[in-house]
Structures are given as C-alpha cells and as structure tokens.
C-alpha cells in the first residue's frame, strides 16, 4: 500500500466520521460544508499488504473559530500502528468561503490516546508482494517545508485529468503526492514514500496545466512545489528512505 493510497484512505474515513450523527455535523456536511485540509504530517511506520484487517482511529485535538486540528492512526486489527497523521483543516461553507465551526464540534475535543501500539513485527514473507514483512520505523512527524526553490530543480508539466479530481472537482492531497512520486520516478529516485509534510495552498482542476517542481533537500528527503503559473498550489517534503 503506497503513501498516496494511505492519504486517500484517511481522507475517506474523515468524511465518514464527519457524517456520523454522533458528532453532530451531519446536517452541515449534507448541506455542503466541510473541512478543507491545510496541512498534514503523515508517516507510515510499517509496510502493510493486502488482506490485513485494519481500522482508522481519529480524534479531534483543537477547535478554533474556523480551523480545527486532529490526529489519525491506521492500526492493524491487533492494535499495532501502521501509519500516523496529524491534520489541520479549515471549515468551509458551500460557497467556498471560511465559515464558523458549529459549536457542537467543541464537545468532541479530546486529549485521549488513540490506543495504537508499536508492537512486534509481523513475520510476513520477504518475497511476497501481498504479505510483506513489517519492519518497524519511528513514524516521526518532523519534516519541514522548504520554501526556496533551487534554480536547478527538476520540472515536469502535468495536465490534470478529470479522473484526478474528487467529488469537489479539485485535486486532493493524495493525488498531489502521487504527482510528486511520479516525478521522482522520472528522475530515477525512489517513488516509494513513507513520510511527508504537506501544505495544501490551492485547488487544481481538470484541464489545468500544472508544473511539478522537485529537488533533493536531504539524504533521503525531497521537496516539491506544485504550481499553476506563478501560483503555488501545494508544497511538500517527502522521505524516500525504504521501509
């Protein structure tokens, strides 16, 4: 399972959570309100393949007037941590403008642990695509965004397809990260990402011509800026060190 797939899975589960009647936001969500993710810090701590039962746990940490923060873990059925994410998002009205978060959401704020554990490595099969071994990594969320683009950065132009867009008709973080992985592969770098710091700044839509700019920023770290003309749509630093 690749990092873009994990990001997409976590987003899908967040929308399910927002629609849960017990959270109290279902009415607003069905009217077209929702959280626009501004920042994500995500790390996979283990490989995981097909056929493994897992669940996504989510907790709300902080709620402001229009911005909220939360944590998510993807855990194996036995509670062992597979991936971890910290998210910061803005509450948007159907018009696309910032809106005040409903007061009911503050009741869901919690300092409780998500309950995942480091656990033991599952044995797996070293030669198996579907049941790989699960070596443990730290899963630290400590990358930083690089703002300066070097003059020799690699540049690749991408035409946004309709199939790259979500139900809101724009490219989400998972597909932005997929563009970055594809660009690294073109350069001969590892497209196998396991950790990323993401800053979502603008919306690309079907038919847009965007430029994916990537450059090395550490031993196994690469930074990226996805642009539409002079506008920066997405910034990221990713870690390509193999699990």
Language-model-derived ranges and their functions:
Residues 1-37, 90-194, 243:
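Hot-dog-fold acyl-thioester-processing enzymes
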Residues 30-50:
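Active-site-flanking structural segment that lines cofactor/substrate pockets
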Residues 37-39, 69-70, 84, 193-195:
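Hydrophobic residues on conserved beta-strands that form the core of alpha/beta folds
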Residues 43-143, 200, 204-209, 215-243:
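HotDog/MaoC-like acyl-thioester-processing domains
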């Amino acid at each position: 399972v690749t990092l873009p797939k994990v990001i997409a899975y976590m987003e899908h589960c967040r929308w399910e959570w927002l629609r849960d009647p017990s959270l109290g936001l279902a009415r607003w969500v069905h009217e077209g309100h929702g959280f626009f993710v501004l920042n994500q810090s995500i790390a996979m701590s283990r490989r995981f393949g097909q056929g493994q039962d897992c669940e996504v746990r989510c907790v709300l940490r902080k709620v402001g007037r229009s911005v909220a923060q939360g944590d998510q873990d993807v855990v194996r059925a036995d509670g062992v941590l597979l991936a971890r994410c910290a998210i910061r998002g803005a509450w948007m009205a159907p018009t696309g403008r910032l809106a005040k978060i409903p007061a009911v959401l503050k009741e869901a704020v919690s300092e409780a642990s998500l309950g995942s554990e480091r656990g033991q490595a599952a044995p797996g099969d070293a030669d198996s695509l579907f049941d790989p071994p699960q070596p443990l990594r730290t899963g630290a969320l400590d990358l930083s965004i690089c703002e300066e683009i070097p003059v020799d950065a690699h540049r690749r132009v991408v035409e946004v397809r309709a199939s790259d867009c979500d139900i809101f008709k724009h490219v989400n973080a998972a597909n932005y990260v997929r563009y970055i992985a594809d660009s690294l592969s073109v350069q001969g770098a590892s497209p196998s990402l396991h950790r990323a710091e993401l800053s979502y700044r603008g919306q690309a839509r079907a038919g847009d011509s965007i430029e994916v700019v990537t450059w090395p920023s550490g031993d196994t770290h690469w930074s990226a800026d996805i642009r539409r003309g002079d506008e920066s749509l997405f910034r990221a630093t990713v870690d390509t060190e193999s699990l």
